[in-house]
């Protein structure tokens, strides 16, 4: 701290990155872009998947059991494996090179199980009396889900999204292989 404070300057947050001026601002901006685009891709898919699994699919069906096992398995995979998958699938196979889109899709695949699981648990945590009251007032299944269940489950869903943001910002292994390391 004593040696670092004298080195703080306005150049530390300039838009130009060079070997002489190693600014942090391009990295911060790229992190914000990456986080926003990943959430834009993963949150709708995750929430709608959770709605389907919690509200529409039969809990005892073989399909739902397979999806839940796959979701739990994907949650435990290390980020380096996701990075290698993204590298092979997007950087090499699709010939995208190191790019923001390769990093975004890889991170979206990585946080999707987290968003699905937390959203599914939040939706299942909504008391059935809310659903029954909505049906009793004449609302259909879709209206009940979007007007009653989702607003009631929103705190749990937002908790999952915040956890996903933390994972997106903290994962470097997946980005080294897909988005590269040098800010441009």
Language-model-detected regions and their locations in the chain:
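Hydrophobic alpha-helical elements at and bordering transmembrane segments
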Residues: 24, 28, 32, 66-73, ...
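Periplasmic/extracellular loop-to-transmembrane helix junction in inner-membrane transport proteins
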Residues: 2-38, 60
